[in-house]
């Protein structure tokens, strides 16, 4: 009998990677503008459920999450709080990680965009794209939504407001670097048409094709000079890298990508990602900007981007200004972590928004867990005692 010893790939951080089929799943990294509510927390719970299921099927799962920590909004929030941006994001990132741990999520990597290795690679990626001719210097003049960290033309606004969040936008005029989006548009359209599973659900794919790709892409502003809290452009340090170029690259920097060609074995095994699980409000960044950046870097695209719906309060999307926010730790204190996980996974369809409230949680948990499951367990125990 010949016994073969299985070899392992040792990934970044010393994590052994087995010969089992890999499954790389990510959430969007949470923006560190404040404490996440249950609507934000839903995504990490869903990703965790998928990761656990894939592990049970025999996959070697790598599950990455983390925090997005740069941008104008962060700089303004820190100024309001009277502390430095780094102190502000340290506090918020710690709180986000605490809640992810409270929800018993089994992530393998928690990346921060202020991590030294991430910042180093973002600088190298920007320079690589510039040297390739995909990034050029110009002047930006248009509208900017600070909460979304997004640029818009006048024609893209809805009633003069941000088409994504509905908030007011501000005029912006500054020197900036731009990425040649149109250079890769036809290639991306072809990829979407030949890979129907790439953008899911189908409604999200249709939205991206009809509203953005088919009408034609404009070049994207990928640097800012009107604020300082960001990763500086190495060869032009008065510019900081646009927050979405910074944030999106976490999916490759977190597993060992190196723009100079010295990527880790872990990266070579894990990439492309099997699933990017994100909210429907950021689908454009992940299915247009991100794949085009990857094409420019000569990297394969993720296998699937799934834009999940929102978890709403009874009167609409959760908002601190509306006073309708529910926090995960408050719900866990009252119901327990497993009950909260059960509710958000049960109540969220994949096509439409779900609704959460204290009343709905009590009703669902009493109906399903206390009554149905409780009755089943009681009958099973009674029969076991009686007949065995």
Task: Label every PLM stretch briefly.
Residues 132-185:
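Cys/His-rich short segments
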Residues 59-60, 83, 105, 134:
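Short glycine/serine/threonine/alanine-rich loop segments
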Residues 2-7, 12, 16:
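Polybasic, lysine-rich low-complexity intrinsically disordered segments
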Residues 88-144:
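A broadly conserved sequence feature marking short terminus-proximal activation segments
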């Amino acid at each position: 009998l010949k016994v073969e010893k299985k070899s392992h790939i040792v990934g970044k951080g010393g994590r052994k990677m087995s010969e089992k089929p890999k499954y790389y799943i990510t959430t969007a990294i949470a923006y560190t503008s404040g404490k996440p509510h249950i609507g934000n927390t839903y995504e990490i719970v869903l990703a965790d459920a998928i990761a656990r299921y894939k592990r049970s099927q025999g996959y070697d799962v790598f599950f990455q999450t983390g925090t997005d920590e740069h941008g104008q909004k962060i700089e303004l929030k820190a100024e309001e709080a009277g502390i430095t941006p780094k102190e502000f994001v340290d506090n918020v990132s710690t709180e986000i990680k605490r809640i992810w741990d409270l929800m018993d999520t089994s992530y393998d990597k928690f990346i921060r965009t202020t991590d030294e290795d991430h910042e180093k690679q973002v600088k190298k990626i920007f320079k690589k794209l510039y040297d390739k001719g995909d990034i050029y210097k110009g002047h930006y003049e248009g509208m900017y939504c600070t909460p979304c960290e997004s640029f818009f033309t006048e024609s893209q606004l809805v009633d003069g407001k941000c088409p994504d969040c509905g908030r007011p936008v501000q005029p912006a005029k500054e020197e900036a670097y731009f990425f040649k989006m149109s250079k890769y548009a036809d290639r991306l359209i072809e990829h979407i048409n030949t890979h129907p599973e790439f953008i899911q659900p189908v409604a999200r794919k249709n939205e991206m094709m009809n509203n953005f790709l088919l009408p034609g892409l404009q070049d994207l502003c990928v640097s800012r000079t009107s604020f300082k809290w960001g990763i500086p452009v190495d060869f032009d340090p008065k510019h900081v890298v646009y927050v979405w170029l910074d944030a999106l690259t976490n999916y490759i920097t977190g597993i060992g990508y190196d723009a100079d060609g010295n990527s880790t074995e872990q990266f070579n095994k894990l990439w492309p990602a099997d699933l990017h699980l994100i909210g429907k409000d950021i689908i454009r960044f992940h299915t247009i900007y991100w794949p085009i950046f990857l094409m420019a870097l000569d990297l394969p695209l993720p296998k699937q981007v799934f834009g999940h719906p929102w978890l709403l309060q009874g009167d609409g999307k959760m908002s601190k200004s509306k006073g309708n926010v529910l926090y995960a730790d408050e719900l866990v204190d009252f119901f327990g972590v497993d009950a909260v996980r059960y509710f958000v996974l049960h109540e969220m369809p994949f096509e439409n928004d779900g609704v959460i409230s204290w009343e709905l949680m009590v009703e669902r948990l009493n109906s399903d867990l206390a009554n149905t499951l409780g009755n089943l367990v009681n009958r099973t125990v009674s029969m076991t005692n009686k007949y065995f």
